[in-house]
């Protein structure tokens, strides 16, 4: 099955104003996507719209599903975004961490990343990342986020300071309002500094897949999205230069996330090994 990869130039997708009150039509030429959280490396607001790993994944899904464009909307909370998918007001959301509770309300695609809850703090910290070391410490979190729930479960004695949005939580950490920031691995890594930050623990609390979600009744889009994500991972495994550039610019060795090529290959190999390989005409990249 041939793979169709979006040029990097289109990764900064244009935003078209969208009213969430309009149901997403199954036969629409527009793929309606909702952005839960404007956070690196999945989404970054630009002058013309959004760019990020989530945007690039949505471009692959757009092409596989035969849509002409992706139309983005933003929401004020994760719950509002979930509700938009559940009610069919939008088609899809990408970059969403898997939880068993959510899986009863929406369908998840194959994951294209792995996340988990970690802590961002100054490099000279005395906290070692164990639950005991967090006792009595104040940690900033996004209100009602999976990370806030995980931290409360693994470290009941921690003092969580909730913020309404990731931007507010990050600003509080950067200003020194909170000494520790708790959240998803990719988000924290993308906003960390190798010289001044520590990201703990080494193995995240509560690891989970990161994928896309669609309405429970939209099996056709779910299938197309899985094919698109599977093709992307297989093309990366096959050494396709364009795919490797697309993925690695956001989460690879030269990004703030800093995953190695071997690490990304291992993840994608694991996912494909429990599903199926997809044949792709890869254009080899230099190792």
Please annotate each region the language model reported:
Residues 9-19:
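Bacterial N-terminal signal peptides
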């Amino acid at each position: 099955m041939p793979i169709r990869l979006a040029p990097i130039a289109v990764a900064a997708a244009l935003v078209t104003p969208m009213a969430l009150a309009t149901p997403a039509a199954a036969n629409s030429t527009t793929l309606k996507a909702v952005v839960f959280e404007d956070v690196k490396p999945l989404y970054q607001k630009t002058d013309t719209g959004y760019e990020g790993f989530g945007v690039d994944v949505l471009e692959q899904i757009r092409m596989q599903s035969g849509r002409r464009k992706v139309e983005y909307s933003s929401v004020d909370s994760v719950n509002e975004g979930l509700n938009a998918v559940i009610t069919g007001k939008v088609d899809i959301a990408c970059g969403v961490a898997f939880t068993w509770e959510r899986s009863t309300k929406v369908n998840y695609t194959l994951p294209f990343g792995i996340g988990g809850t970690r802590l961002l703090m100054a490099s000279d910290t005395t906290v070692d990342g164990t639950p005991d070391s967090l006792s009595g410490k104040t940690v900033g979190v996004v209100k009602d986020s999976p990370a806030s729930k995980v931290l409360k479960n693994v470290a009941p004695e921690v003092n969580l300071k909730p913020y309404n949005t990731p931007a507010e939580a990050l600003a509080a950490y950067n200003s020194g309002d909170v000494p520790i920031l708790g959240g998803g691995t990719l988000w924290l890594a993308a906003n960390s500094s190798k010289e001044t930050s520590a990201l703990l623990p080494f193995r995240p609390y509560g690891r989970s897949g990161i994928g896309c979600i669609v309405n429970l009744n939209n099996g056709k889009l779910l299938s197309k999205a899985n094919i698109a994500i599977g093709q992307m991972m297989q093309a990366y495994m096959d050494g396709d230069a364009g795919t490797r550039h697309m993925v690695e610019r956001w989460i690879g060795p030269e990004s703030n996330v800093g995953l190695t090529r071997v690490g990304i290959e291992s993840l994608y190999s694991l996912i494909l090994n429990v599903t199926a390989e997809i044949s792709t005409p890869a254009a080899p990249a230099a190792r």
